[in-house]
Amino acid sequence: RPPRSTLFPYTTLFRSGLIDIIDYGKINDVPFFCTCGVGFDAFVSLQFSKAGRRGPLTYLEKTLLESLKYRPETYELEMDGSTLRYKAFLIACGNASQYGNNAYIAPQATLNDGLLDVTILEPFTVLDVPSLSFQLFNKTIDQNSRIKTFRCQTLRIHRSKPGVVHFDGDPMMMGENVDVKIMKKGLQVIVPRDAEKDTSNVLQRAQDYINGLKQI
């Protein structure tokens, strides 16, 4: 149970906030609100869920250890009537711009445009890690040469075998075909009455709060 001091801002928000309408997504009909995807980030989410210890240090430890042995997969992507093949380290679908903790995997994503922002990280070398890490936290990862990005309303990801996916950091096993779609204007949220008209970080603040509870 979270401490009362943590809940106080939210009880105030429920009493005095305004209702706004934003997008959310579905991955094989499972709702997500910020990001979902396949590949390395999903694999790390699975390993993290099995760890006896929690917290950001455990997550960092799992990320570093697993990155040394993880092998990229080849995916077929179907969207807007076309099919593309990519060998990818990860494929992230963003409704919001970041995973959490200021790691911006889809820096151009917004919560009210009715589109998924898809980020593909192609295979890279150890020499690429410093720039990728810096750009991930500097909102410029979409400018890296190892990154491919596009926008769509629906996306089918086909892989050679079933495996793990993640939705908002939670792992789940799914089949060879993974269907991702955006649900435009499908979610009502409460925002602070005195906030500027900008919902780009509403769900992200909620996601950071939820992540904090998971690490307790």
Spans of model-derived segments:
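Short, small-residue-biased leader/transition segments that mark boundaries at the very start
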Residues: 1-13
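ATP/nucleoside-binding phosphotransfer catalytic cores, i.e., glycine-rich phosphate-binding loops
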Residues: 79, 85, 110, 120-216
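Catalytic core of DAGKc-family lipid kinases
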Residues: 11-89
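Gly/Ser/Thr-rich active-site loops/lids in small-molecule metabolic enzymes
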Residues: 50-58, 107-128
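Glycine-rich phosphate/pyrophosphate-binding beta-alpha loops
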Residues: 37, 41, 92-107, 171
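A residue-level signal for conserved active-site and pocket-lining positions in enzyme catalytic cores
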Residues: 25, 44, 91, 118, ...
